[in-house]
Structures are given as C-alpha cells and as structure tokens.
C-alpha cells in the first residue's frame, strides 16, 4: 500500500490523531503525496528540512512546521503530551514521536508517521515512507 491509498478515506481517521516527523531528506518526492490535501496539509518542505505535523481530527486542529533547524512540539491531549522532534540531515538527522517516554517513530529517512486513537492515545498504526528516493511512496513498517 502507498501513502496516497492509505490516506484516501478520511472518514477512517475521524477520531484519530496523526503525527508526522521527518528525518534526513523528506522533500524530494513529497509532491507525489496527493492525499496530503485530504488531511489539510500544505507540506511546503525545503531540501533536507525538518518537518513536523499534528492532525487532530477529533478537535479539528492542524499544525505543521518546516524549517532547516530542528523542530520540536509537545501536543497536549487530555492529561498527556505527544512529544515530537524532527531534525533534517543538517540539523541532527532524527525523528521522534513519544508519549510517556515510549518511542513510536521508526526514525527512518523520509516521513515517520504514528496514528493514535483520540480517547485512549492507543497506537493505531505506525510506519515510514521514504519520500527522498521512493517515487511510489510505499508504506514500510
């Protein structure tokens, strides 16, 4: 399955929180991610930039930020925080998505994505997509 197929049915993500953290070089093939518009994302990512995004479909909240420097964000859901770090190739080369010190990022090149259920923050799915080299945007676990 590829990234466009995965995010084609937005109703499935109604009560979910989608978290994205980029590592290394996420920009080369990102324009092929056509379903990003279904999620409300612009994904204006420069070469070797850091990038984070949070899509909270329950609350209708979308946040995204890209920059050459390391990006960090803590998103509060009820009494817990989702801590997100993205560092592009030249700013640390790292991806992290944590809840209560538990790591959910695959920490691989491209986009690292974790999806959580809104009520419990239980992990629904996690995967990565090599948006640097993989033109088909294949989901890898």
Could you say what each language-model-derived stretch is?
Residues 1-141:
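Short acidic-hydrophobic catalytic motif
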């Amino acid at each position: 399955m590829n990234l466009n197929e995965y995010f084609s049915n937005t109703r499935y993500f109604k009560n979910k929180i989608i978290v994205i953290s980029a590592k290394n070089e996420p920009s080369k093939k990102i324009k092929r991610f056509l379903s990003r518009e279904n999620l409300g994302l612009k994904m204006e990512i420069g070469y070797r930039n850091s990038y984070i995004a949070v899509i909270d479909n329950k609350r209708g909240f979308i946040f995204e930020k890209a920059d050459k420097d390391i990006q960090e964000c803590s998103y509060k859901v009820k009494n817990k925080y989702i801590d997100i770090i993205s560092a592009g190739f030249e700013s640390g080369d790292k991806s992290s998505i944590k809840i209560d010190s538990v790591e959910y990022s695959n920490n691989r090149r491209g986009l690292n994505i974790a999806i959580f259920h809104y009520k419990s923050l239980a992990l629904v799915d996690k995967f990565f997509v090599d948006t640097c080299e993989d033109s088909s945007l294949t989901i890898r676990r």
